[in-house]
Amino acid sequence: CKKQRLAILNTFQHLIARVLDTDGLVIAQDADLSDISIDYLKQLASNEIEPWIAINQWQAKQGWDVYFYDRPNPTALIHQLELDLRAGHKCYVTTDSRSGRYGSETIDRYIKQTLKQLEDSYTKTLVVCSHTTNTTGHPAVDFVSSINTQAPAYDAVFVTPTLGTGVSIDIKHFDRVYGILQGVIPDPEVRQALARVRANVPRHLWCAKRGMGTIGSGSNNYRSLADWYQENYKENYALMSPIMRIDVDA
């Protein structure tokens, strides 16, 4: 997506303009709507438009019970996950990475091996990530396509940001939601990921104290950061000018 970003944006602009020029309808949805999204879409239109905006003001009458694990690592949370599965609870586990020490695949392997050794039983689990959902014949493909039908087949489902938005698990199957966040994705995406299961069930959450990414060039010097942002701003403007009709020299 990054490599083809300009081509994607160019195609998107032409599609929006074409639809609006032919009296078509553009329906835009955003779980974290702001003026940035609205202004961007208005700028893509070839003519001035005034969008009709519907805001969902609904709020739950009762909040979630959330258990935060204030520890250096998520081992205590993973132990609680193990106990819940041994007690027969169905668990939905959202992570922000597929591989690594606390990635979805690693935790999935650990849980299956541990429970099999302790109980000599098989816990049916599923990992949903970019790799499994793009593998022909993998159960994750069917899971994503009909999530409310497939969910009851699993004791635990481990997901990455691949399933962080765009789906709604309405069926009452999962008894617990777990979140293991190492600072890879921003907090709005974390909230979205934890809300995929709609039922008001307990949420167990571990978050890293610091994110894994860097800001700008990664420098700790404010002057270096300012210079990087200024240069990056100019480069992006130059790249975007043919698409967004920006006068770079203005």
Model-derived regions: residue spans:
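SF2 helicase catalytic motif II
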Residues: 1-28
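Conserved strand-helix element at the start of the C-terminal RecA-like helicase core
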Residues: 29, 33-37, 78-115
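Interdomain hinge/linker at the junction between the two RecA-like core domains of SF2 helicases
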Residues: 32-84
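Conserved RecA-like helicase motor-core motifs
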Residues: 48-57, 92, 115-135
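Long, low-complexity intrinsically disordered regions enriched in Ser/Thr/Pro/Gly
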Residues: 85, 123, 130-132, 145-151, ...
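Conserved helicase motor
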Residues: 96-99, 125-142, 160-163
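Conserved two-lobed SF2 helicase motor
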Residues: 151-166
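Conserved SF2 helicase motif VI
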Residues: 167, 173-204
